[in-house]
């Protein structure tokens, strides 16, 4: 069994490649860049991995669904809302269903598993935790959510600090821990070490489990 710790855009190629050649692959996804917008709960890294495994990903952009349309976003702009976060119409359906399931008491891990089943994905995909974990960047004295810093402000401005809000209280998903413990090989996929991998290894217990594979 191979277990991959993955971000989104930088990790999805490796995930797809291994999943196409190996039958027993587990993917543990970062959740530090999850974001509430328009009342929808958006999980960019999880969705990128799922879309990639389902061959739905817009490979040119590295995110979102290929050939998606943006009528929803245009209408939000007409109604006076900001449109800096590019949500496609089909992508919006994913966020809407996830948000409704969360409001009905489902955990993020349950929803992720359900979505994998809907897309006929055999590879197991787990969020690193079902708890709140948020990556925030301090720039010019202001604390910004990672999406606001990278997407809204395009990464402009000095980085004065980085915080993983909730990492000290978040519990690693038991299935994710088991996937690390039972793996013959654990791979940390390509990704930003601070914003994709950092949130995961700052959760209590994850670094300890990974250190067992140190050669």
Residue ranges and their predicted role:
Residues 10-15, 195-199:
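Short glycine/serine/threonine-rich phosphate/pyrophosphate-binding segments
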Residues 30-164:
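Electropositive, gly/pro-rich neighborhoods at or near active sites that engage anionic ligands
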Residues 26-32, 214-215:
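Short internal beta-strands
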Residues 183:
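An anion/phosphate-binding loop that grips the pyrophosphate of nucleotide cofactors and donors
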Residues 1-3:
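Extreme N-terminal starter segment of soluble prokaryotic enzymes
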């Amino acid at each position: 069994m191979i277990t991959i710790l993955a971000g989104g855009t930088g990790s999805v190629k490796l995930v797809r490649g291994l999943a196409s050649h190996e039958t027993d692959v587990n993917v543990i996804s970062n959740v530090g860049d999850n974001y509430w917008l328009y009342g929808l709960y958006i999980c960019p890294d999880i969705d990128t991995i799922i879309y990639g495994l389902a061959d739905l990903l817009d490979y040119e952009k590295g995110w979102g669904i290929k050939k998606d349309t943006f009528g929803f976003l245009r209408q939000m702009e007409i109604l006076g809302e900001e449109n800096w976060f590019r949500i496609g119409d089909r992508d919006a359906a994913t966020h809407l269903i996830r948000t409704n399931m969360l409001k009905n008491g489902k955990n993020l891990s349950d929803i992720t598993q359900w979505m994998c089943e809907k897309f006929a994905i055999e590879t197991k995909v787990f969020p690193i935790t079902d708890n709140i974990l948020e990556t925030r960047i301090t720039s010019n004295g202001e604390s910004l959510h990672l999406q606001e810093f990278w997407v809204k402000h395009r990464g402009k401005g000095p980085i004065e600090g980085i915080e993983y809000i909730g990492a000290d209280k978040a519990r690693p998903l038991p299935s994710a821990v088991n996937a690390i413990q039972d793996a013959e090989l654990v791979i940390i996929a390509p990704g930003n070490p601070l914003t994709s991998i950092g949130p995961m290894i700052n959760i209590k217990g994850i670094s300890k489990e990974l250190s067992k594979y140190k050669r």
